[in-house]
A protein has these predicted regions:
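N-terminus-centered regions that define maturation/targeting leaders and the start
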Residues: 1-181
Length: 181
């Protein structure tokens, strides 16, 4: 008999194990750090990406990338819900719904394919009855304007390549739990 979902160990926050970097601030009109996300931003509630706005990043920042990662997904490697890369330094926010299409993004920014298979935001969708999952929304400040990746680059590979260029990071963590039926 296998382990029940709720009984598995809590996954670590993946950013706590990375080399230290400076921090800055990310806020949202839609999410509050440590609190449940509104249903609008879940897979069953509309799949609408939340508003994010950031400030206080280092002067040497040349671009950003934004991601949403669920370390609590019942997989060996968590679940990437969203990644937008090549965000110009002049862009310091993403509007609610910007995750629906590259057409909603500024300048050269574009989506990488998430673990759900599409180039867009995919809302919270933990298994019914599992404990609350953490959704870590991260804004990464990079010291280069682009890594030269295309939209077929995997999120894990992009994150790996971006590590040596990340000079600061801001995170906001929301939670969500799908009730048991």
């Amino acid at each position: 008999m296998g382990m029940r979902l709720f009984d598995r160990p809590l996954a670590p926050n993946p950013y706590e194990g990375l080399s230290p970097s400076a921090t800055f601030t990310v806020v949202s009109q839609d999410l509050s750090n440590g609190l449940p996300m509104p249903k609008l931003h879940t897979a069953e509630g509309g799949n609408i990406s939340p508003h994010l706005e950031w400030s206080g990043f280092p002067d040497q920042t040349e671009s950003f990338f934004v991601s949403c990662f669920d370390p609590d997904a019942p997989t060996p490697s968590g679940f990437w819900h969203w990644m937008v890369i090549d965000i110009p330094v002049s862009c310091t926010s993403l509007a609610r719904g910007a995750g629906s299409s590259d057409l909603e993004l500024d300048g050269s920014a574009f989506h990488l394919r998430g673990d759900h298979g599409d180039h867009s935001y995919f809302g919270a969708a933990p298994p019914a009855g599992d404990r609350p999952h953490r959704y870590i929304f991260s804004v990464h400040a990079l010291d280069i304007p682009t890594l030269g990746c295309d939209d077929d680059t995997s999120l894990a590979m992009y994150s790996f390549e971006a590590l040596e260029h990340t000079i600061a990071r801001a995170t906001l963590t929301a939670t969500y739990q799908t009730p048991s039926n």
